[in-house]
UniProtKB/Swiss-Prot annotation:
This is Adenosine deaminase. Residues 1-19 form the signal peptide. GO terms for molecular function: adenosine deaminase activity; metal ion binding. Catalyzes the deamination of adenosine to inosine and deoxyadenosine to deoxyinosine. Induces degranulation of host mast cells, and secretion of tryptase and IL6. Modulates enzymatic activities of human tryptase and chymase. Induces release of cytokines, such as IL1B, IL6, TNF, CCL2, IFN-beta (INFB1) and ISG15, from host monocytes and macrophages. Activates host NF-kappa-B signaling pathway in TAK1/MAP3K7-dependent manner. (Microbial infection) Promotes replication of dengue virus type 2 in host cells probably via modulation of cytokine production in host macrophages and monocytes. PANTHER family: ADENOSINE DEAMINASE, ADENOSINE DEAMINASE 2. Proteolytically cleaved by human mast cell tryptase and chymase. Coiled coil: none annotated. It is found in: Secreted. Female salivary gland (at protein level). Its cofactor is Zn(2+). Keywords: Hydrolase, Metal-binding, Nucleotide metabolism, Secreted, Signal.
Length: 533
């Protein structure tokens, strides 16, 4: 009986009218195509060679032509580079760019490639910050000056307060000169160097997260400010920082500055205009002393935590500086940790009211997040008309931004060591800049805050980018292209760029002639030693 009912039910269903719009035709299978033959091995090899050649033609530096001396040096340096990379390929733990820089700082000097890069004229640094330009030694030197007072002790994660004053600021303050007497200069210097650095011998355990290291970073600035913003120190620190960049064969600098309150013993607090005037005067004096130095431009870059009311005051300052220093002021940016900070979209209504003659150089995408307000700063930076992008670490997650960067020639300022120290990347071989290097994007390599990582103004960053991020195939043409890019994508006008290229070319040709002689002499000596051993 149950079987009979089931049959009747099914028969009834077949008589139901099904609405025509619910009837879908079965997807047709694709027509089978004749199976082609596989290529022969010789054909495969030809296709492979053509494929790789096409990739090579897209590499950053592929369009650079080397002189005879450069070709000679290139041959030697590529032998050195490939030797280091081959050793790293067989033992990646001992490959410098694969490790945290704090773990291998003492090994850079053992690298032949690094020692050559140190001698290389690297053009300019387009991404650096005012209170992190010079080495920690410059800060230590400042603590020997008279009238410096200290409040509190050196802690594990914080430092004492400092202040220059003719009179004792309060009962809890002590003269640093007196503290040095009972602590000894050697011990005190070591304490200062430790406080004003992010360096830690065990960085992976010392800094568990990006927020941990940013917290130390911000505490460092808070402790440093009253010490370094004393007017005589501020001036000397800037001058000595320029000398350190110059000694690292950096001929040009564009740096961001927050314009903090600079003060003197008479109680004067310098205005924004007076601080920029100080920068300008010191720069001109430095250029007069070192004629092959190209120059400096300043990017006003206050913090991104400002309220709407505070932000308007910052823009008013920007307008005043632009009018008084139309050539020395390169433009405007916002600094500070992006993730907790306000987004560019929030500031856009006010930013769009600035005159078009004020250029933007926005930090954007300094984050590991995707689809959040931080990486979307990249979109806003492009739409706001930024001339360059600071870091752009998340740019690979935004393909349209990548297209616009190429179309508009928006340069990305890559800071590999800073990205590692601030926990964005652990192994430089995984740095997203590898893609930018592989397809000739507009890029420069800079150093961000070299002093806090105990690295050189640019050589350490160039080295890890050259051996760890760039292709094993990328050679001196890559290095030369980066140096040229630092001039091309700078804020200099066309006349200034012409002069800059002349000065850089002279330095480059001179160094390459010396390197060629040294390499040939070294090779002859090596062969002679091999014969007598």
């Amino acid at each position: 009986m149950k079987i009979l009912l089931a049959v009747v039910f099914v028969l009834n269903l077949t008589n139901l009218a099904v609405p025509q719009h619910l009837i879908t035709s079965s997807p047709s299978l694709p027509e089978s195509k004749p199976v082609g033959r596989r290529p022969t091995y010789e054909e495969y090899k030809q296709q492979r060679e053509s494929f790789l050649q096409t990739e090579d033609h897209h590499l950053l530096g592929a369009n650079v032509t080397l002189t005879e001396n450069e070709q000679l040096v290139n041959k030697f340096i590529m032998q050195m580079k490939l030797d280091e990379m081959e050793k790293g390929f067989n033992d990646s733990y001992n490959f410098i760019p694969a490790r945290h820089i704090f773990e291998v700082l003492d090994r850079f000097g053992q690298s032949k490639v690094f020692n050559v890069i140190r001698r290389l004229p690297k053009g300019g640094v387009l991404h650096a910050h005012d209170m992190a330009l010079g080495s920690t030694d410059l800060i230590v030197n400042a603590t020997y000056l008279e009238n410096l007072w200290q409040k509190g002790n050196f802690g594990l994660n914080h430092g004492p307060e400092f202040k220059f004053s003719r009179e004792r600021p309060g009962k809890e303050w002590s003269l640093v000169s007196e503290i040095r007497q009972w602590m000894t200069n050697e011990v005190y210097d070591a304490k200062v160097a430790e406080v004003f650095s992010l360096y830690n011998a065990d960085p992976l355990n010392a800094y568990k997260s990006l927020d941990n290291v940013w917290s130390k970073f911000q505490n460092l600035f808070a402790c440093l400010a009253p010490l370094i913003t004393f007017a005589p120190v501020w001036r000397q620190y800037y001058h000595d920082s320029l000398k350190q960049f110059y000694d690292d064969h950096v001929q040009y600098l564009e740096f961001r500055g927050v314009l903090p309150e600079v003060y003197d013993l008479d109680g004067k607090v310098y205005s924004a205009e007076e601080i920029v005037q100080l920068y300008y005067e010191e720069t001109e004096q430095f250029k007069a002393k070192y004629p092959d130095f190209i120059g400096v431009k300043f990017i006003y870059a206050p913090g991104r935590y400002a309220s709407d009311e505070e932000f308007q005051k910052l823009l008013d300052t920007t307008n005043r500086l632009h009018k008084k220093f139309p050539n020395f002021l390169a433009g405007f940016d916002l600094v500070g940790q992006e993730d907790p900070g306000r987004s560019l979209f929030e500031f856009a209504p006010a930013l769009l009211k600035l005159p078009a003659s004020i250029n933007f150089f926005f930090h954007a995408g300094e984050t590991n997040w995707y689809g959040m307000k931080t990486d979307q700063n990249l979109v806003d930076a492009v739409l706001l008309g930024t001339k360059r992008i600071g870091h752009g670490f998340a740019v690979l997650k935004h393909p349209k931004v990548l297209k616009e960067i190429k179309r508009r020639q928006i340069c990305i300022e890559i800071n590999p060591i800073s990205n590692q120290v601030l926990k964005l990347v652990q192994d430089q071989r995984n740095h997203p800049a590898a893609l930018l290097f592989s397809d000739n994007y507009p890029v420069v390599v800079s150093s961000d805050d070299p002093s806090f990582g105990r690295s050189t103004p640019l050589s350490h960053d160039f080295y890890v980018a050259f051996t760890g991020i760039a292709s094993a195939k990328q050679d001196w043409r890559w290095l030369k292209q980066l140096a040229l890019n630092s001039i091309e994508y700078s804020a200099m006008n066309s006349e200034e760029k012409t002069v800059a290229k002349e000065k850089w070319n002279q330095a480059w040709d001179h160094q390459f002639s010396r390197l060629a002689v040294d390499f040939v002499a070294g090779k002859i000596l090596e062969n002679w030693i091999m014969k007598i051993v």
